[in-house]
C-alpha cells in the first residue's frame, strides 16, 4: 500500500477525539450553508483577480435528425456516374488498379521465385492438411489452387499467402466427422435416401441419380461449411463489421492457435504409429484420443513408426537450418517436397503397403471434377460451426495483411480483405474445396523469397495446376505417416510460442493469463469452445481492468506546471489545502463505487466528517446552556462547522473516456457530500464527450460552469484565488476566517 493511502484527513467519528471537531468561538452560529464557492465573485470580467480563466468556444453541432441523415446517406450511395462506377469496380477488383502499372523489370523475378517456392511447399502441405480435414488428398490441392487465383483478383495485400490452413482444416474435420457419424450409424434400411452396403455407408443423391460414398459425402459437408463461412465473411465485409476482429487480441489468437496445435498433433499421432483409430470429437477429444492410442499401442505398425522417425530426423533439423540461415539462403530448402518424393519412391519400390500393410494416400485423380453446388440440406446442421471458422479465417487474414502492409509501407483495406477471403471460400465451394485463409509460415517464406505483388499467387497456382494435371497420380504410394509428420513439423512455430511466455509475462500479466486460458481450453475442451472461452475471458478481463483502475494523487513539478503521481515520481509537491485526484478508467455503473471509495480514501471522507461533526455537536449542546431554536440537526451542523485544512478537491478527468448515467450521478453525489462540509469540487481536463455528458446530466447550473477547467493548473489557480477572495488563510493546519 502506497503512502498516499495513509492520509491524515481520513476521519472517523469513533477514532477521532472530540477536540478535533471543536469550532472557533468567533464562528457565527447562523453561518450560511450551501455551496462552498460563491461563483458570482469570480466572473471573467472581474479585473481584481490575478487568476485568468481560459474560454474555448464550441463548434455548432449539425442537426442530427435521423431521417435526414439516412436520406443523405442513401442519396450519396445511390448517386451514379461513370467515375463512381469505375471507382467501385476498381475498389472491388484491386487487381485492375495495380496490374496495368506492374513494373516487369523490377518485380517479375521476385514474384516468380516466391510463387515457385510457395507452390512447391504447398503441394505436400495441401495433401497432408486434406487428411486433417477428413478429405481425400486431391481436395487439398484444389483448395490451394483456387484460393491463390481468387485472392489475386480480390486481395489488397501484396505479400500474404492464402491457401489451405491447418487450424481451419482441423475445425472442418471435426464437423465432417460429426456429420458422417450422424448419417451412418442411424441407418434406416427402408429409407430411399440412405442404404447400408457391406463396404460401409452410402448416401443416395436422387438429384444426381447416383451413389455418394463416404468420401463424396465428406466433401459435400466440407464444401457446405466452406460456403457458409464465405457467406458470413462477405456479409461482415458488406455491413462493415470488421470491428469483430478487435475482440480477438494477439494473445487470444496466439493461445488459440497453440491450443489447436495440440489437437492437430494428437489427431496425427495415429498416422505416425500406423494405428487405425476412430476420430474423437467433442469435449475432451485430445484426452480421449490419447487414451485410445495407449490402449492400442501394441498394434503399432513398425514400418510406419520407422518411416515417421526418419522423416522427423530429416525435417526438424532442416527446418532449424532454414530458420538459422534464412538471411543467407536465396530460398528455403524445400525439404518437405524432397521427403515426399523420397518416401514415395521408397514406398513404391519397397512395396510397403503390400508387405507391411502401411497405409498410403491411394489414388489421386488428375484434372478437375465437374463443379457441384454445396448440399443446401446440410446448411442448418453446419451454419453455427461456420461462424467460428469464418471469424478465425478473416481475423488471421486481416491481421497478417495489416502486419505486412505496415512493414513494407503500403495500406490494405480491411473490408476488402474480408470480401477477398469470403470469395476465396464461396467460389471454390462449388469446386470441391474446403475453407482457406492466410497462413503466417507460408507468408514469411513468400516475403523472404522476394515477393513484390500478388502476381506470385498466379505462379503458385501454375505449380499446383501442373501437379493436378500431371504429377498427382505419382503420389499413390505416399505413406500417410509421412503426411502426418509434415503436419506435425509445421506446428513447430505455434508450439514454440511457449518460449515467448517469460517476455509476455513481463510485458503484460493479463495477456499471459488470457493466452493460458485460451490455450488450455482449446486443447482440453475443443477448438470451438476454446475460442468462445477465450473471447469471454478477454471481455471479462477488459471489464476487470475498468473495475480495478489505477488511481493516484497528483503533485506539481517544481519548475513546471506538470502534475504527476506522487507515488510514482519523486520531488513533487502538493498545494496546501488542495488535493488533485486522478482516476484512470471510464466512470460508469461497474466502477462507480470504486471511484467514490478511492476518492474518499485518498482525500477525505466527507460522510465520516459530517457524522463526526454531528456527534461532537450533540455532546457540545448538552454542555452549553444556550437555548437554540430550530431543527436539532440544523443547529448541530451550525455548531460543528469545523474548519478543515482541505478546501478543494480537483478531479483530473483526462483519463475518463466516458460517463454513463450512473457516473454522472456519482459525480453529483461526491460534489454534494464535499460541499456539505465546505469543500469545493472542481473537474479538470474533461474531454468533449465527458463535458457533453455533464451538460446533458445537469451536473452544474449555467452559472456554475466555472467548476469545469481545461487544465489542472487553471483549476488549482482558481482554487487558490477563491480562498484568497474568501479571506481564509491556513495557519498550523487550521482555516481562520477573516470576518
Curated annotation (Swiss-Prot):
Carbohydrate attachment residues: 205, 357
InterPro entries (alphabetical): S04_transporter_CS, SLC26A/SulP_dom, SLC26A/SulP_fam, STAS_dom, STAS_dom_sf
Region (Disordered): 1-44
Location(s) in or outside the cell: Cell membrane; Apical cell membrane
UniProt tissue specificity: Cartilage and intestine. Expressed in the kidney (at protein level).
Cited PROSITE patterns: SLC26A, STAS
Gene Ontology MF term list: bicarbonate transmembrane transporter activity; chloride transmembrane transporter activity; oxalate transmembrane transporter activity; secondary active sulfate transmembrane transporter activity; solute:inorganic anion antiporter activity; sulfate transmembrane transporter activity
Keywords: Cell membrane, Glycoprotein, Membrane, Phosphoprotein, Transmembrane, Transmembrane helix, Transport
Residue ranges occupied by any STAS domain in the UniProt entry: 568-719
Transmembrane portions of the chain: 112-132, 137-157, 227-247, 255-275, 378-398, 420-440, 455-475, 524-544
Signal peptide range in chain numbering: none
Topology class, membrane: Multi-pass membrane protein
Catalysed transformations (reactions): oxalate(in) + sulfate(out) = oxalate(out) + sulfate(in); sulfate(out) + 2 chloride(in) = sulfate(in) + 2 chloride(out); oxalate(out) + 2 chloride(in) = oxalate(in) + 2 chloride(out); bromide(in) + chloride(out) = bromide(out) + chloride(in)
GO biological process assignments: chloride transmembrane transport; chondrocyte differentiation; chondrocyte proliferation; sulfate transmembrane transport
Record-level GO cellular component terms: apical plasma membrane; microvillus membrane; plasma membrane
Modified residues (Phosphoserine): 12
Gene3D superfamilies xrefs: STAS domain
Post-translational modification: N-glycosylated.
Described function: Sulfate transporter which mediates sulfate uptake into chondrocytes in order to maintain adequate sulfation of proteoglycans which is needed for cartilage development. Mediates electroneutral anion exchange of sulfate ions for oxalate ions, sulfate and oxalate ions for chloride and/or hydroxyl ions and chloride ions for bromide, iodide and nitrate ions.
NCBIfam families: sulP (TIGR00815)
Family the entry assigns: Belongs to the SLC26A/SulP transporter (TC 2.A.53) family.
Name assigned to this protein: Sulfate transporter
Source lineage: Eukaryota, Metazoa, Chordata, Craniata, Vertebrata
Encoding gene (name): Slc26a2
